[in-house]
């Protein structure tokens, strides 16, 4: 059971490759239906005074791709920035920079998905 939040000391020791591997393993757990059980009350209590996410994920706003769920991550594990089509703009860039430079996240992951309506709309509008 996941009942311990990431601490600053744990976050500082993480390497980007290990974080990526953890996210991939989380996605494999989601796909196989063997997601970890989580004690949300414990995690809320532990993160009330601060957060030390291991990664920031840029994802589409598509309601069929709830990032924390498809990566099997718990409260405090990751930052998520969502915008239609995973499009980076100045606001999103600021969030990504904050996540890494200020909050200490070790990895930026861009999470795409199939049949993205925003990407299709952008491609259909090309002249």
Q: Each PLM stretch: what is its role?
A:
Residues 1-2:
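Disordered regulatory segments flanking catalytic cores
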Residues 5-87:
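Short, conserved "active-site rim" segments that organize catalytic pockets and cofactor/ligand binding
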Residues 16, 67-127:
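Short HxH-centered metal-ligating active-site micro-motif
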């Amino acid at each position: 059971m996941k009942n311990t939040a990431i601490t600053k000391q744990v976050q500082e020791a993480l390497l980007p490759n290990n974080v990526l591997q953890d996210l991939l393993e989380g996605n494999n757990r989601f796909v196989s239906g063997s997601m970890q059980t989580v004690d949300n009350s414990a995690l809320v209590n532990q993160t009330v005074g601060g957060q030390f996410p291991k990664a920031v994920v840029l994802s589409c706003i598509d309601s069929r791709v709830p990032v924390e769920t498809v990566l099997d991550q718990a409260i405090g594990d990751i930052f998520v920035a969502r915008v239609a089509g995973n499009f980076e703009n100045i606001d999103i860039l600021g969030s990504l920079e904050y996540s890494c430079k200020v909050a200490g996240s070790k990895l930026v992951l861009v999470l795409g998905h199939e049949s993205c309506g925003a990407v299709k709309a952008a491609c259909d509008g090309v002249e």
